[in-house]
């Protein structure tokens, strides 16, 4: 799996409300979170399917 999958979930400092998904190394699953719309990191996906394809081993 790519190293960015292991980054902590980071909603970012902006105040938008965008549905997104991140991979949790602890559970080896993808979970939903609310993305603020700016910054954040590479552990952010538009769909749970994309998250699973990329990060779940």
Curated annotation (Swiss-Prot):
User: Keywords for this entry?
Assistant: Disulfide bond, G-protein coupled receptor impairing toxin, Secreted, Toxin
Q: Where is the BPTI/Kunitz inhibitor domain?
A: 5-55
The record's function comment reads: Interacts with vasopressin V2 receptor (V2R/AVPR2), probably in a selective manner. Inhibits vasopressin binding human V2R in the nanomolar range (Ki=7.34 nM), and also potently inhibits vasopressin-induced cAMP production (IC(50)=26 nM). In vivo, intraperitoneal injection of this protein into rats increases diuresis by 8.6-fold, without any loss of electrolytes.
Gene Ontology cellular-component terms listed: extracellular space
Subcellular localization: Secreted
Q: What protein is this chain from?
A: Mambaquaretin-4
What GO annotations for molecular function exist for this entry? serine-type endopeptidase inhibitor activity; toxin activity
The primary location reported for this protein is secreted
One Pfam short name? Kunitz_BPTI
UniProt cross-references to PROSITE patterns, sorted A to Z: BPTI_KUNITZ_1, BPTI_KUNITZ_2
Record-annotated disulphide pairs: 5-55, 14-38, 30-51
Answer whether the UniProt record assigns the keyword Disulfide bond to this protein.
Answer: yes
Q: Give the lineage.
A: Eukaryota, Metazoa, Chordata, Craniata, Vertebrata
The record's annotation in InterPro entries points to: Kunitz_BPTI, Kunitz_BPTI_sf, Prtase_inh_Kunz-CS, TFPI/VKTCI-like
Give the organism the record lists.
Answer: Dendroaspis viridis (Western green mamba)
Name the family: Belongs to the venom Kunitz-type family.
Tissue and organ distribution: Expressed by the venom gland.
* Domain topic, free-text comment: Exploits its two major loops and engages more positions in its interaction with V2R. The pharmacophore defined by numerous amino acids positioned in loop 1 (9 to 18) and loop 2 (34, 39 and 44) may be at the origin of the absolute selectivity of this protein for V2R.
């Amino acid at each position: 799996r790519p190293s960015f999958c292991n980054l902590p979930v980071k909603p970012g400092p902006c105040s938008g409300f965008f549905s997104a998904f991140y991979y949790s190394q602890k559970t080896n699953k993808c979970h939903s979170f609310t993305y603020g719309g700016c910054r954040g990191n590479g552990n952010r996906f538009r769909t749970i399917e994309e998250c699973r394809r990329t990060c779940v081993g």
